[in-house]
């Protein structure tokens, strides 16, 4: 894939209007925890905000840099978003007006076939979002049966995690599982026939679980959100969009535990009692938004 092709793969920013509506009046500094191709960051730069954006994947960062090269107030960091405290200048920490987390995996990663994120492509198992050494191949072919069961159960919420882990180990003992298509076939043919053709492909949650393990996604998320109170200024706002229940549970728990109410001290005022969802119109025009859940909190 050449650079021209890469620049054509532009992820439509999810719930953009809603995101921008929560930026405080007279805001000056924003942090985009999940830059991707830069759609949300660009919109904030267009509002004349100084934006500090994090992206762990150097390939997609290059796309965003080219797209945003004419913005003087764009600052980027090629790192995971749990490293904000280490990366941001001391003059920024505690003075941020607005923070955004868009936790969805970018369209770029599914389109860039050599990563093996999609079981629709017959490519080597990889699934790395950044420079981490462990790949999906290493997890599938190197983890013990017990470790595989844990990953499938905890990160895929797969009811037959033990059976599926056992099947994977038996198959890899015959020969290494090299590609996404091989793994998909193993899962499909070891799923009950009654469940093979449901709304969700039987491999979907397995691939999700492996991807989360490879990239340590939930641990990084928990560490990062714990730093939000230190990074935001008073009355600053954070918006988090999640795309599966594991992420949303972490966000909901963190906000609830740190919510200020009449009966307890806390750090945040919750700006929405129920999660905000994309409109039907957005889902039609941008199907990738369909599972998005938005939570918003203000530091008090």
UniProtKB/Swiss-Prot annotation:
Pfam families: Methyltransf_5. One of its GO terms (cellular component) is cytoplasm. It catalyses: cytidine(1402) in 16S rRNA + S-adenosyl-L-methionine = N(4)-methylcytidine(1402) in 16S rRNA + S-adenosyl-L-homocysteine + H(+). GO terms for molecular function: rRNA (cytosine-N4-)-methyltransferase activity. It comes from Brachyspira hyodysenteriae (strain ATCC 49526 / WA1). InterPro entries: RsmH (IPR002903), SAM-dep_MeTrfase_MraW_recog (IPR023397), SAM-dependent_MTases_sf (IPR029063). Its EC number is 2.1.1.199. Keywords: Cytoplasm, Methyltransferase, rRNA processing, S-adenosyl-L-methionine, Transferase. This is Ribosomal RNA small subunit methyltransferase H. It is found in: Cytoplasm. GO terms for biological process: rRNA base methylation. Specifically methylates the N4 position of cytidine in position 1402 (C1402) of 16S rRNA. It is an enzyme of class 2 (transferase). Transmembrane segments: none annotated. Belongs to the methyltransferase superfamily. RsmH family. S-adenosyl-L-methionine binds at residues 38-40, 55, 85, 102, 109.
């Amino acid at each position: 894939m050449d650079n021209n092709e890469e620049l054509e793969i532009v992820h439509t920013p999810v719930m953009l209007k809603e995101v921008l509506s929560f930026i405080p009046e007279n805001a000056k500094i924003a942090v985009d925890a999940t830059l991707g191709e830069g759609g949300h960051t660009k919109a904030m730069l267009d509002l004349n905000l100084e934006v500090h954006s994090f992206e762990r994947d150097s390939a997609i960062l290059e796309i965003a840099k080219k797209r945003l090269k004419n913005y003087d107030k764009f600052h980027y960091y090629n790192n995971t978003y749990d490293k904000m405290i280490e990366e941001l200048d001391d003059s920024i920490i505690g003075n941020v007006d607005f923070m955004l987390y868009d936790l969805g995996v970018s369209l770029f990663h599914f389109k860039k076939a050599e990563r093996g994120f999609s079981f629709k492509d017959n490519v080597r198992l990889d699934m790395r979002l950044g420079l981490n050494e462990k790949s999906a191949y290493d997890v599938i072919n190197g983890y013990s049966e017990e470790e595989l069961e844990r990953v499938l159960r905890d990160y895929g919420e797969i009811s037959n995690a033990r059976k599926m882990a056992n099947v994977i180990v038996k198959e890899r003992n015959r020969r290494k599982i090299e590609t996404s298509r091989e793994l998909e076939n193993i899962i499909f043919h070891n799923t009950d026939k009654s469940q093979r053709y449901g709304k969700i492909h039987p491999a979907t949650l397995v691939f999700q679980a492996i991807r989360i393990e490879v990239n340590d996604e939930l641990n990084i998320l928990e560490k990062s959100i714990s730093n939000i109170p230190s990074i935001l200024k008073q009355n600053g706002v954070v918006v988090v969009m999640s795309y599966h229940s594991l992420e949303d549970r972490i966000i909901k728990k963190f906000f609830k535990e740190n919510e200020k109410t009449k009966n307890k001290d806390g750090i945040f005022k919750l700006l929405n009692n129920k999660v905000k969802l994309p409109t039907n119109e957005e889902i039609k025009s941008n199907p990738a938004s369909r599972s998005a859940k938005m939570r918003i909190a203000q530091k008090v």
